[in-house]
């Protein structure tokens, strides 16, 4: 019997997954509800439609998103092939003519002899090998099915994330390691503020510019996840009883309690990334860098993932997903794209590439491929399946996710070049196995 896989959703992840499957001789039933049923964000019936920006971000190898794109080129990604063909001048970034970009992908996928297109809404998960790549605006009926399959508490409908910072960029002379009331091991880095420093920070925060909500996000309610700037506007002392509460966090250098304390919590197993506890925010990214840079210790902080609050649909991947993008409780069911907790166009496509390769291996009775964590594709899969289950939030690819180099290199550009070189070597070895 001929092997086939259902792919639900023809966005960036679904289109890439379908392409990787047909490249390996696997038949694909590709389901896309547009244009029969539109989402609030899409405008066309094309596959891999770019709904926000036309930029696929940095292209150079001193940036992690440039590395993941190069890895995808080595693995014959249709998304990157199309982006390269449809590129428009954008300095060091890869930006595209969005109509040419999605048109090229639509034509290649639709016209492939192994692809059958189904223009209909999927409301229940099919039997047999399937990849779910329905994106952040998954239809309510399918979301209910996913909830039933993964467990009600493991499906989320919005993203409320605090900024994540590279540990190497924190001024360790100004912060101290301590847990509140010294309970358990000292697990947090603490940024102490004097009253004057707090007041300066407060004024900057309440007057900072926030990002505009998109029309389709306006119904989102963030219970228990109030943006820090909204909390601050309720009164100058509100944060002192919330995320900046200094009680039980005396500075071991002085023995005194600071006026306010921001806690940073380790975000990855390697201890290279820290998140700002309780600082989910809707500030514009430039404002986040400026305002949070007023906090002692964070003056030169490298924010690898800015705080966001927006409509999203994603599963708790650390709980329910394998690094191969297979569901732990049903190994013929794969997830790909933003649904898995990867953030961004390129990252979504990369997860589709990995899921597509592994779904092909599954139906052809081959061993699944766990992409090496030294690679950008592997570092992302490793992060979303091993991050904290309790506080899991979507993540962009960044060098903070990569394992550290055996020899410490202080110069950032040189360090990034070495990480990129190691990543591409790792992917070349994977490509040889395929």
UniProtKB/Swiss-Prot annotation:
GO BP, one annotated term: tRNA wobble uridine modification
Query: Key word Nucleotide-binding present in the record?
Result: no
UniProt EC number: 2.1.1.74
List the catalysed reactions.
Answer: uridine(54) in tRNA + (6R)-5,10-methylene-5,6,7,8-tetrahydrofolate + NADH + H(+) = 5-methyluridine(54) in tRNA + (6S)-5,6,7,8-tetrahydrofolate + NAD(+); uridine(54) in tRNA + (6R)-5,10-methylene-5,6,7,8-tetrahydrofolate + NADPH + H(+) = 5-methyluridine(54) in tRNA + (6S)-5,6,7,8-tetrahydrofolate + NADP(+)
What UniProt keywords apply to this chain's record, in alphabetical order? Cytoplasm, FAD, Flavoprotein, Methyltransferase, NAD, NADP, Transferase, tRNA processing
Q: Quote the function comment for this protein.
A: Catalyzes the folate-dependent formation of 5-methyl-uridine at position 54 (M-5-U54) in all tRNAs.
- The name this protein carries in UniProt is Methylenetetrahydrofolate--tRNA-(uracil-5-)-methyltransferase TrmFO
